[in-house]
Curated annotation (Swiss-Prot):
Expression across tissues: Spermatocytes (at protein level). Testis and ovary specific. Not expressed in somatic cells.
GO terms for biological process, alphabetical: meiotic cell cycle; sister chromatid cohesion
Location of region: Disordered: 1219-1248
Gene designation per UniProt: Smc1b
Domain text: The flexible SMC hinge domain, which separates the large intramolecular coiled coil regions, allows the heterotypic interaction with the corresponding domain of SMC3, forming a V-shaped heterodimer. The two heads of the heterodimer are then connected by different ends of the cleavable RAD21 or REC8 protein, forming a ring structure.
Role noted for this protein: Meiosis-specific component of cohesin complex. Required for the maintenance of meiotic cohesion, but not, or only to a minor extent, for its establishment. Contributes to axial element (AE) formation and the organization of chromatin loops along the AE. Plays a key role in synapsis, recombination and chromosome movements. The cohesin complex is required for the cohesion of sister chromatids after DNA replication. The cohesin complex apparently forms a large proteinaceous ring within which sister chromatids can be trapped.
Positions where N6-acetyllysine occurs in the chain: 648, 713, 1032
Entry protein name: Structural maintenance of chromosomes protein 1B
Annotated Basic and acidic residues bias: 1219-1228
Coiled-coil ranges per UniProt: 163-502, 666-912
Binding site for ATP: 32-39
Record family assignment: Belongs to the SMC family. SMC1 subfamily.
Cellular localisation: Nucleus; Chromosome; Chromosome, Centromere
Length: 1248
């Protein structure tokens, strides 16, 4: 047998580009991590072997192209090729290509159709439909759990007997139709034969009409013989029917007993499953109780974590705000530093300019000492002359300077105030947004809270009602249990009572409107104190059966005889001799009439009570009863409450313990009602317990309500604080800043106006001073060549003053900037300290949150574990409930079967009673006929016996049963000679014909002279009718023969198809059933292991299931479901290998068949596969267990690589270079795998 050499895949599923997988050895294992694409090798082999797309884990064929599952296929086509090499060395190539949403098939290099492709695969032993070389993942487990019918379908696929199913069903239907047609034509032929017989009789009557005169002498004999003949024939028929009916009744009773046994077994199973369900429910309740404790802890931990997270978010927000303010502060500091730098540069530039100007002016004007003295003298004159004006001018200048400084200060205040106002407005907007969010959150919380409170109220009300109802139910149950315990009645009936109850039920079903029941069940005393007295007086009638009529009572007695049941007393309403009631007895004091202390719901039964009780009286004490019974002028029947009875005859009968036990039967009905009430209350209590479990939901809702209330309270407090405190403060500050801005604006305006007015005054004083100076310095100015003295002073003296002034302003401005810079830096330092403090708080908060989250996760883990356990128990509970429901359904089905069979028994018993009545009536008719012969001296010939043996008394249906039985037994010994009876009279078929002839003979006997005149004229056309009927009979016979021939041909055709299907199936089944035991022994490495297949239908095994059972080594026989997972897997593998041996493929591919095997079974299975791969066929196995694939001849490793999507790579390793020396030594206890520790990388010298 050849072998698979290589597998070539191109852009198939996880294989990108063209990949070469192989070469494959006799025993090759494919290994790799999960998700690497190992199963895609299996899919590639399935694909190239013609498998349908639906079995390849995709919806359409284009999804098999690499990258298609991500929406980015790398190509529009993909292909898979296998290279198969025959033993002769011939190489065969099979290729399947995906192109344009369709498959193309190539054998060798030529495209072929699918049918040719499949045929070429079958030539090398691969059957596509049977999948005889592929075992997919999970198939082994599914094979071990197959139902017998599914296993049969599996065998039909392997044996190809399923190909005959259509033809088999068609031939079978055709055969059934042909047989129905043949039966129909047979019935037609039978009816025509009856017509022909009837026509013959009419012809015989016509012929006998001529001889009627001769037969008048023997008319009485003929009449008697005729009656006796058909009476005896009817008796024989009835006896035969009675025997047959008794046989049928026995069979049906056996069936009833069988179904009743099944019903009892099912009820026993139902009780066991119910106890298991109760235990599981108890366990579920325990888990739910623990869950109810842990869930609030988790909710509390979650709320605590949420609260700390909110505080952390608030701290982070404060850090963000502080960081923004720090950023603004830093920008301000940088601006101040830049301003200081600019100020220093400006000062240095100014000093440089001043030095240059001084040098220039020194060159322009140079005064002599005399001129300088004269200048000082003139200057002193001017000072004295304008001293007052100078003082006023200086005063104005100082005031103006002060006002300018105030104006500059107010402008700086204006800028700072505007900045603060802008910041206040931003904070107001932020708080408004925060208010909106809080109001929205508050509204959501209130809506949620209202909803939860409604749910809480509803649940509280429901639970309170449930608890109240549970209390009431428990009280009622307690009372009922006490009553049942106080009753102390042994209610378990014996077999005798059960049999009597069953007989009564049968009678009620036979006569539903006529059998009322036992007297005990139809009435009861008006008070418990009368129970003993009523029981004593009723006596044997207490369990008597009340029926409607005497006839029904006799039918019931016959039924009891037929059933060999115990004798029963019957009270027929139309047969009772009822004595009138003595109304005067009601007037006697100290007693009551017995009929007055008994009540019934059925008015027609009062006659029965009157018959049983008569004029009996009931008294309180024994003395009163004795006095009333014997103390008066006439004796009366009286009974005391303790059961002591005084009869008219003087007999006194006392009460007894047996009487008390009998009297307890009156309580049976009440106890039955109490048990029904108890069952209803127990069921209601179970439902209430289910409702009470909602307390868990109530606690959860209460916890949620509490958490929501807390969050709502925090939100409302924060909202109120923002509205009433923060926002009001900001608005107040905004108002203050706005009013302050207005004040500053008005101050600036006023200061500007004052400065302008002062400037005007300064200019006026300066003009006056200038005029004085001009007058005094006029000559001096002309001498030095200047226009006026101010020009000289501006160039020399004034310049120095201006320089001093400038220096003073520079120093003031620099001082101000330094102060402002230091203040800003202090503020920045404070904010940074705040940020550090907040960061420390956040860090600590994060640590707290981590701890809280850890606590929360622990709580959540516990809750989730409990919930998982709860769900698992619920699943078990659901499974048990489902099993109970199934058992309950089966019990109901068996109950229906029992009732159906019981109805059938009742029906058959009724028919038996009817037949017995008819038989007794016929025996009575025979006796009266023989008696008539004896009395009227009708000489009938007797073969055995004599008419003298007939007792000369006429029997009726009311005679004693024993007497009639003796008479009938004597008459049965008399044998009558019916040879004188005409043959035509013996040949009558229907009862109607018998009655007609009987009437005819009676008329003939009654009127001998007028017989010819009164007899109906015969059918004169009987001969023609007979000819017509004979032609019709011949035609129906021909049609019947044709239909019977057609049915025979259909039977032959059906048997041929049946034989072909049976042969195909049996050939496969016999081969597998023989080889599976040897394979299982080899797999288990033990000859004591057994595996066997057995068909449920040996004649046609493909119509029913096939059972598969294995006996593991060292274990007793048990069903397949009770085997362990590893044993099931080995059994399934044995079946797979046995099936494969029937239609062996050149190679066998299995996907993770070792998944359910333990180490021991892995060693056995791998050793067996090793042997088979060397001797029989090539094995390719996908495996994840090193203990398994270490036995292989070669390994193919599959590993994934991820780029845009995952794609697979392949490595190969030849293990034949590493012999398994441990196997040769036979060491099995501590075996290590022989896989060498080599690097499985593309650069490895062993890799391909």
């Amino acid at each position: 047998m050849g072998h698979l050499e290589l597998l070539l895949v191109e852009n198939f599923k996880s294989w990108r580009g063209r990949q070469v997988i192989g070469p494959f050895k006799r025993f090759t294992c494919i290994i790799g991590p999960n998700g690497s694409g190992k199963s895609n090798v299996m899919d590639a082999l399935s694909f190239v072997m013609g498998e349908k797309t639906t079995n390849l884990r995709v919806k359409n064929i284009q999804e098999l192209i690499h990258g298609a599952h991500t929406g980015k296929p790398v190509s529009s086509s993909a292909s898979v090729t296998i290279i198969y090499i025959e033993d002769s060395g011939e190489e065969k190539t099979f290729t399947r290509i995906i192109r344009g949403g369709c498959s193309e098939y190539h054998f060798g290099d030529k495209p072929v159709s699918r049918s040719v492709y499949v045929a070429q695969l079958e030539n090398i032993g691969i059957i596509v439909k049977a999948q005889n070389c592929l075992v997919f993942q999970g198939t082994v487990e599914s094979i071990s759990m197959k139902k017998p019918k599914e296993r049969t379908q599996f065998f039909e696929e392997i044996s190809t007997s399923g190909e005959f199913i259509g033809e088999y069903e068609a031939k079978k239907k055709k055969l059934q139709k042909a047989e129905e047609d043949a039966q129909f034509h047979f019935n037609v032929k039978k009816n025509v034969a009856a017509e022909r017989k009837h026509a013959k009789i009419e012809k015989e009557e016509a012929e006998h009409y001529q001889n009627l005169l001769e037969e008048l002498k023997i008319n009485k004999i003929q009449l008697m013989l005729f009656q006796l003949y058909y009476n005896e024939e009817k008796i024989n028929v009835l006896n035969t029917e009675l025997e047959q009916m008794d046989g049928n009744l026995s069979v049906v009773k056996d069936t009833l007993s069988h179904h009743e046994n099944i019903f009892k077994a099912k009820k026993k199973d139902y009780g066991m499953l119910t106890r298991q369900l109760q235990q599981t429910a108890k366990e579920l309740k325990s888990v739910e109780a623990i869950l109810n404790q842990k869930r609030p802890q988790y909710i509390k931990a979650k709320e605590n974590t949420s609260h700390h997270l909110k505080k952390l978010d608030l701290s982070k927000k404060l850090i963000t705000d502080n960081e923004k303010q720090c950023s603004k502060q830093e920008d301000g500091i940088r601006a101040l530093v830049a301003e200081l730098a600019d100020l220093d540069r400006a000062w240095k530039s100014f000093e440089k300019q001043m030095e240059e100007k001084i040098l220039q002016k020194g060159r322009d004007i140079e005064l002599e000492n005399s001129q300088l003295d004269r200048y000082k003298l003139l200057k002193e004159q001017v000072r004295r002359k304008v001293g007052i004006m100078t003082q006023q001018l200086e005063k104005l200048q100082w005031e103006q300077k002060a006002e300018k400084e105030r104006l500059a200060f107010e402008k700086r205040r204006h800028g700072d105030t505007q900045g603060n106002l802008k910041q206040i407005k931003e904070q107001i907007e932020e708080h408004k947004k925060r208010i909106e969010k809080l109001e929205e959150y508050t509204k959501t919380c209130m809506d949620c809270l209202e909803d939860k409170k409604q749910q809480e109220e509803a649940l509280k009300k429901e639970i309170e009602n449930t608890k109240s109802r549970m209390s009431e139910v428990n009280e009622e149950l307690s009372l009922i249990r006490n009553e049942l315990q106080n009753a102390g009645i042994d209610n378990h009936e014996g077999k005798r009572q059960q049999k009597r109850a069953e007989v009564l039920e049968h009678l009620k079903r036979l006569y539903p409107d006529s059998v009322f029941g036992r007297l005990l069940d139809l009435c009861h005393p008006i008070h418990k104190k009368y129970q003993l007295a009523v029981t004593k007086l009723f006596g044997r009638y207490m369990v008597a059966i009340v029926v409607a009529s005497e006839k029904i009572a006799k039918d019931c007695i016959r039924f009891l005889k037929a059933e060999r049941a115990e004798p029963e007393t019957f009270l027929a309403l139309d047969y009772l001799d009822i004595k009138p009631i003595n109304e005067r007895l009601r007037e006697i004091k100290g007693c009551k009439m017995m009929i007055d202390v008994i009540k019934t719901q059925f008015p027609q039964l009062k006659k029965v009570i009157q018959f049983v009780c008569g004029n009996g009286l009931v008294c309180e004490t024994v003395e009163e009863a004795r006095h009333i019974a014997f103390g008066g002028p006439e004796r009366r029947k009286a009974v005391a409450l303790d059961g002591t009875l005084f009869l008219k005859s003087g007999v006194i009968s006392g009460g007894s313990s047996d009487l008390k036990h009998k009297a307890l039967c009156w309580d049976e009905k009440e106890l039955h009602n109490l048990r029904d009430k108890r069952s209803q209350l127990v069921q209601e209590l179970k439902e209430l317990m289910k409702t009470l479990r909602k307390e868990t939901d109530l606690k959860q809702i209460q916890t949620l309500v509490q958490g929501t209330n807390t969050r709502l309270k925090y939100s409302q407090n924060e909202l109120e604080m923002i509205k009433k405190k923060h926002l009001a403060t900001f608005y107040r500050e905004q108002s203050q800043l706005q009013s302050e801005l207005l004040n500053i604006d008005s101050q600036c305006t006023m200061l500007s106006e004052g400065i302008n007015k002062q400037q005007q005054k300064i200019e006026e004083f300066q003009d006056k001073i200038d005029e004085v100076e001009d007058d005094i310095f006029q000559d001096f100015c002309e001498e030095i060549g200047v226009e006026n003295i101010r020009e000289f002073e501006n160039k020399h003296v004034k310049q120095q003053q201006e320089n001093d002034q400038k220096r003073l302003e520079f120093e003031k401005q620099k001082t101000r900037l330094n102060i402002q810079l230091e203040y800003s830096r202090n503020q920045l330092k404070k904010k940074l300290n705040n940020i550090d403090t907040l960061k420390t708080t956040i860090q600590k908060g994060k640590e707290d949150i981590d701890n809280l989250k850890k606590t929360e996760e622990e709580c959540l883990k516990i809750v989730e574990e409990l919930m998982v356990k709860q769900e698992q128990i619920k699943e078990v509970l659901a499974t048990q409930s489902s099993n109970i429901e199934k058992i309950h359904i089966q019990i109901e089905e068996e109950r229906k079967k029992v009732l159906a069979v019981d109805r059938e028994v009742g029906k058959l018993q009724k028919e038996v009673v009817i037949i017995q009545g008819s038989l007794e009536q016929k025996l009575l008719e025979k006796h009266n006929l023989l008696l008539d012969c004896k009395v009227q001296d009708i000489d009938i010939s007797l073969v055995l016996g004599s008419l003298e043996d007939i007792i000369e008394m006429e029997l009726t249906e009311t005679e004693s049963t024993q007497a009639t039985a003796d008479i009938y037994e004597k008459e049965a010994s008399i044998q009558i000679d019916y040879s004188p009876l005409r043959e035509d009279l013996k040949a009558l078929q229907s009862d109607k014909e018998v009655e007609a002839h009987l009437t005819l003979l009676l008329q003939q006997v009654a009127s001998q002279e007028n017989t010819l005149l009164k007899t109906t004229a015969p059918n004169l056309r009987a001969q023609e009718n007979l000819k017509t009927v004979r032609d019709k009979f011949q035609e129906s016979a021909d049609v019947f023969e044709a239909s019977r021939k057609e049915a025979r041909i259909c039977r032959q055709e059906f048997e041929q198809v049946k034989r072909r299907r049976y042969d195909a199936f049996s050939q496969c089944f016999e081969h597998i059933s023989v080889s599976i035991d040897q394979i299982y022994k080899k797999l288990c490495r033990n000859n004591s292991a057994q595996a066997f297949l057995s068909p449920e239908n040996p004649e046609e095994p493909y119509l029913d299931g096939i059972s598969y059972n294995c006996v593991a080594p060292g274990k007793r026989f048990m069903p397949m479901d009770n085997l362990s997972g590893g044993e099931k897997c080995v059994a399934a593998l044995a079946l797979l290998f046995a099936v494969h041996s029937f239609r062996p493929a050149p190679f066998f591919v299995l996907d993770e068949v070792d998944a359910a095997l333990d180490n021991t079974n892995i060693g056995k299975v791998s050793s067996y596969i090793k042997e088979q791969s060397q001797e029989q066929f090539q094995m390719i196995i996908i495996s994840l267990k090193e203990e398994f694939y270490s036995k292989a001849d070669a390994l193919i490793g599959v590993y994934p690589e991820h780029n845009e999507c995952m794609f697979s790579h392949v490595l190969t390793l030849d293990l034949s270079k590493y012999p398994d020396t441990e196997d040769q030594e036979g060491s099995r206890s501590h075996r290590k795998p022989r896989v060498p520790r080599v690097s499985m990388s593309p650069k490895s010298p062993q890799s391909r």
